[in-house]
Amino acid sequence: MKRRRRWRGWLLFLALCFCLLCEAVETNATTVTSTTAAAATTNTTVATTGTTTTSPNVTSTTSNTVTTPTTVSSVSNLTSSATSILISTSTVSGTRNTRNNNTTTIGTNATSPSSSVSILTTVTPAATSTTSNNGDVTSDYTPTFDLENITTTRAPTRPPAQDLCSHNLSIILYEEESQSSVDIAVDEEEPELEDDDEYDELWFPLYFEAECNLNYTLQYVNHSCDYSVRQSSVSFPPWRDIDSVTFVPRNLSNCSAHGLAVIVAGNQTWYVNPFSLAHLLDAIYNVLGIEDLSANFWRQLAPYRHTLIVPQT
């Protein structure tokens, strides 16, 4: 009987210990793992023995690409344009062929003869207005032409006449003060003259400076001459300056052969055909390349005695 009681006591004791052990295990040995995934948040629960720790680990990565639109407004470039004429200064070299297939020599420097010649050209156009339909003037401008030096090569042959419609030259003509009148022989054939004195009787002594002045307008070309005083370097004291030259009609735009050049020097007046005067000027251009303006000058002019210069008193 005593052994059975002992065994019962031990069994009860073991059962009590077993129950206590089970409770301890249920209380202290619990592992909880919880993972919650959100769109931008992750909660991680770390399992520890006897302790439950919840550590929120928030990881939010946002990649924002902001595109700012660039607005380019259309800009109208307003260019204010005015009617204008572009004039350039140039130097033209060479020879000019005419209808007779001869080479024309233009201009020279009387004080310094050379094998090439030049003309100093000054062009001053008139003011021009642009008128609208209602008659209002919309723009006024006066274009200016610069100086232009034209250089050509002297021709070995006889040059043709220079048309005053293309070359209106300001010349200086002189007459001998001892002469009351001037007689110019008009003859198509070249006479055989014995000496240089006879040339002096036939030819009117003259000196000139070439300066071209052309007045351009929209309708026509206005020819005018400006006459300068004798240069101090020219040693021709017995000669007298020309007083005035007038072209009739004033505008030779149609290049009519009926025009006249009225030359006044002192108390004498000459009525010169502009075309004939052009022939004479060509002759002067051609011979001023010689070294001295002596008797050879008149001899060289002899082929051009058909030039009509009629003195009037």
UniProtKB/Swiss-Prot annotation:
Residues 47-73, 90-117 are annotated as: Disordered. Glycans are attached at residues 28, 43, 57, 77, 101-102, 109, 149, 168, 215, 222, 251, 254, 267. Residues 90-114 have a biased composition (Low complexity). The keyword Signal applies. The keyword Transmembrane does not apply. Keywords: Glycoprotein, Signal. Residues 1-24 form the signal peptide. Belongs to the HHV-5 US34A protein family. This is Uncharacterized protein UL116. The gene is UL116.
